[in-house]
């Protein structure tokens, strides 16, 4: 018996296996299938599975096997045939299920049959794809469809889901083959919640699908939604409350969640309320509803300009903040009666730039033909400048800078207010009231004269040192200066530099003794071209740093630039340059001075007749009396018709308004022109020094040599030297600022005539000696004595240098003209 059963067992085992893809002679082991079509020989099974996709072949323990199990559950749901697999059916529904399942099996269920097409079937066509099938090919036949209908193995799929019919089980309905699931749905609706066939009389239909009445509820809170509002999420219904709490999107603009009742705009995973306020440009807030927009970095913009962060209504310049601040202060200064300073700033910027290149940023030109290089070559040895003129103008700068007791309150900068209000160690004191100053001008008190012993070791003023101008420039660039960008009109930066000079004891008693000689007007023609106006250039740099002159009054100031080519340079759009390289916010004020000054030079006027000064002792004016020059240099002074000095006359349109000073009315209005010149005197000086050299050497006075000077110093009294040193420390730091004005103001001669002698006192030689004024007192105080310098000329009494006052140079305009005609001072010795 076992021997008879052995062939049958081997045949059964062979039916459960398939041959390998290789030849049987290769010796490879046969692979098992999880399922094989019934009634086929091994070679026929191999041909059938060869027609299927590899991933769908049901090898044992293969993805194809898992796919087969999944398709069995999906295509043939057990709850469609068996009551035990249903969750909640009434007794009536259970009966209906049984009837329904039996009817389907009876009327539609079938299994496909695998056959090889015979050679006689020459015109067989696949029912699914419509392509012709040849004899000898494997084909699937469905008995319910008819004997002549066949399909390719890969085309035997459900008509609804287009999936291969698992295990060749099909349901035939209306000429189409279906899987068990979709065939049942053709007859009865299926609940989307429980996946069961709905046998009840009522159901809920939504979104093209059906639910049991009790199954159509919120997935979160299980609230029945029949007849209510709901929201579908991934095929599941939610009530509005649960959906907002779980899945509501938040607006990118306002941050609030977008409710179910609100329309929303969505782009690239971002959401906005569909309102003009929320769905708008991130930069200009323009509504983008119905408009194209530009997304960038999570934001939406209306244009490329807005996406770059630019304001189309504002300036795109990087210095617009500085420019707007300067414009505001310029407008405020005009309302307050203060000058906009645009013309001075343009000229000073031109001085610091090459003559033909306005964009050069340096303080001195690198080319030999630049204007700053030429100015540097004027006086290289004039590092410490004319003491007499400097002390006169600088004392007036300090006086006028602190004139208004409440001027500090007009400035917005806190540091400027402190400097204006308190000064540095009471150096700048509040001046007396306007009434007192009209009555009399006080002499400088002794306590204002600070004699610092360390001043003897300083041979230059602080601002005159080579590195100082660069240091203060960098300081202002860093925002450390009081008026670094010209944001407010005020003298704080200039005054602070003067205070620093005093603190460092600049230009002490032992100053370079050649400066007196080199700074005097008579010696200007001896200056070598290699020399530079160091202090004038420093003052220009400092003026550019602060962006505001010390005076800042709205009265037009004279423009005393006498270089031949400078006015041509000045005419070329000087408003394009400002202190810091930005557009000058005060461009409208550029023509007030340049046009008037040129006008005054084109139209020469009558020369003011000279007046001989009153015979009074030579006295040095104190800080309170020495305000900056208040005189407009009109054409009667600048005109050189009678002096043979080549000074170009400006056109009529650029002439400054001439101001005539009536010194006999000084008692009634002594302070109407107080804030006229301050730092401008420093910058103007650099230009006029060039024309001063045209005086020949024969017009100079006899001067002391260094050896004679040492002997002269030893002969001076100790008390006189002490008084001199005090004044030298106070006024010595102001260097080289006013030597150019001496030639051009005979009106100032009248102004200072009360304090000087006639021409003899200004131009007296050192051959005679007198002790009458060696120790003079005035108003109970010793007369301040200027510092002695080498190569310095003195008056007959040897009490003080004649150039200690600017007055001699104001009078030398007339004396030099006399000398040209053969008239000399009675005590003058021409060297």
Swiss-Prot record:
UniProt-listed InterPro entries: LIM2_prickle, LIM3_prickle, PET_domain, PET_prickle, Pk/Esn/Tes, Znf_LIM
Start and end residues of each PET domain: 14-122
Example GO molecular function: zinc ion binding
GO cellular component: cell trailing edge; cytosol; glutamatergic synapse; membrane; nuclear membrane; nucleus; postsynaptic density; proteasome complex
Modified residues (Cysteine methyl ester): 828
Keyword Translocase among UniProt keywords: no
Pfam families: LIM, PET
UniProt keywords, alphabetically: Cytoplasm, LIM domain, Lipoprotein, Membrane, Metal-binding, Methylation, Nucleus, Phosphoprotein, Prenylation, Repeat, Zinc
Protein origin, superkingdom: Eukaryota
Phosphoserine modifications at: 315, 591, 594, 683
Entries under CDD domains matching the protein: LIM1_Prickle_1 (cd09483), LIM2_Prickle (cd09418), LIM3_Prickle (cd09420), PET_Prickle (cd09827)
UniProt-annotated location(s): Nucleus membrane; Cytoplasm, Cytosol
Disordered: annotated span: 314-346, 664-688, 763-831
Segments of skewed composition (Basic residues): 669-680, 815-831
GO biological process, one term: heart development
Propeptide stretch(es), residue numbers: 829-831
Subunit and interaction comment: Interacts with REST.
Family assignment from sequence similarity: Belongs to the prickle / espinas / testin family.
Entry function: Involved in the planar cell polarity pathway that controls convergent extension during gastrulation and neural tube closure. Convergent extension is a complex morphogenetic process during which cells elongate, move mediolaterally, and intercalate between neighboring cells, leading to convergence toward the mediolateral axis and extension along the anteroposterior axis. Necessary for nuclear localization of REST. May serve as nuclear receptor.
Protein name, UniProt field: Prickle-like protein 1
Species of provenance: Rattus norvegicus
